[in-house]
Curated annotation (Swiss-Prot):
GO biological process entries: cell differentiation; negative regulation of cell growth
Species classification: Eukaryota, Metazoa, Chordata, Craniata, Vertebrata
Protein name: Oxidative stress-induced growth inhibitor 1
Keywords: Differentiation, FAD, Flavoprotein, Growth regulation, Monooxygenase, NADP, Oxidoreductase, Phosphoprotein
Pfam families per record: Pyr_redox_3
Cofactor: NADPH
Post-translational modification Phosphoserine, affected residues: 12
Presence of keyword RNA-binding: no
Family membership noted in the UniProt record: Belongs to the OKL38 family.
SUPFAM superfamilies assigned to the protein according to its UniProt record, in alphabetical order: FAD/NAD(P)-binding domain
Entry's cofactor comment: No monooxygenase catalytic activity in the absence of NADPH.
Primary role: Monooxygenase catalytic activity. Involved in regulation of cytokinesis; promotes RHOA activity, probably acting locally at the midbody in late cytokinesis. Monooxygenase activity is involved in stabilizing transient structures between daughter cells, termed intercellular bridges, before abscission. Regulates differentiation and proliferation through the regulation of cell death.
Enzyme category, top tier: oxidoreductase
Keyword check for NADP: yes
Amino acid sequence: MTSWRHDSLGASSSEPLPVVIIGNGPSGICLSYLLSGHIPYVKPGAVHPHPLLQRKLAEAPGVSILDQDLEYLSEGLEGRSQSPVALLFDALLRPDTDFGGSIDSVLSWKRQKDRAVPHLVLGRNLPGGAWHSIEGSMVTLSQGQWMSLPDLQVKDWMRKKCRGLRNSRATAGDIAHYYRDYVIKKGLSHNFVSGAVVTAVEWAKSEHGSPEVQASSPLFQVNGYLTTKDHGHQPFSLRARNVVLATGTFDSPAMLGIPGETLPFVHHDLSALEAALRAGTVNPTSDPVLIVGAGLSAADAVLFARHYNIQVIHAFRRSVHDPGLVFNQLPKMLYPEYHKVQQMMRDQSILSPSPYEGYRSLPEHQPLLFKEDHQAVFQDPQGGQQLFGVSMVLVLIGSHPDLSYLPRAGADLVIDPDQPLSPKRNPIDVDPFTHESTHQEGLYALGPLAGDNFVRFVQGGALAAASSLLKKETRKPP
């Protein structure tokens, strides 16, 4: 346990921390790097291939990106994210990656300790967050270079580990190890507290921006507990001037909401299949494993099961020709294994002969009931019912963030308060150039909680938040 952990998680701390970050995945790690005094500058003589951006960068030579107008710099950029600062940071880190190029980043990084902002990063797992919960051999959706954090390329890190990238992509195990290693190599470990579970975040009921209230007491109270080695709970209470939500969306799996979903053979994560294989309760001669879902997690489960010759029934509610199906949006050359799953889904019906032994698909089938005798009941596209015997069920239809530690579980923070929080449809409403909540001063949201779902783009949110937090520290009275 570091001194930070002793001092800052104790109940007797007198001074509030400037920043507490909840979540230690890529967003939290990147923000910690920036708040630790690592400041990005444009390399002298670097020329960006985007003419408009290059002209703007040339207007302020020697001024760090964090100290420039992010709205001005990001204006006119286009790409695969709705976040303007995400597009800006991505363009600076990977200038021509969308065109298949490999131009080096135009950024250089300078350590300026006097600009570091004291902070803590609280996470349930080791640094890397949910990446430590993903089956290690799974190949990442994004290319390896897109998983990199600032100033340490995944490919360079893997080269030192005497590993190479498969199809330009790394395994989930590689990435989890990379993020954990990044925190160590960049000297960030003293800011990170693993095994920390936040149970409540509260803030003063004051008028927006009231300096009198903020001067007399910290705005935020962060309560929770540390999981000890003997699985006990050690409570902690923190006070902070700013809180950053960076917990991602893997906390709570989405449910079908049908009878039998809580039976012991029904699971909602891929690790259950791994455990069943290790225990020998599932094998090539057992009844099929039922996989429900048509996203990438379900595809990963299909690939994992087929690798071990486990029979699979794959059920999903969409048509295989639905343009909204994620497989219909992925380039075949970059993602050959997902294209293979898509091909199997298209070609194989449970009612037709199968050239893929051990795999059957159930397109446009709605699960109705799971029975104690390991029977699964479905409604088919014609309205009839189908019954299948299965060894186990994996329901992989997405997940929801768990913000139960916030007042009203964060319902007042989203874009449409009448609808539930959804990273894709109804994220937390933030200022796009600071990532500060539009509803609560001092509260920030990064990553999927703010609508950014790929590691490649979550770093832009960290840049925006760091810029805002650094400006606050500069303005803070002595």
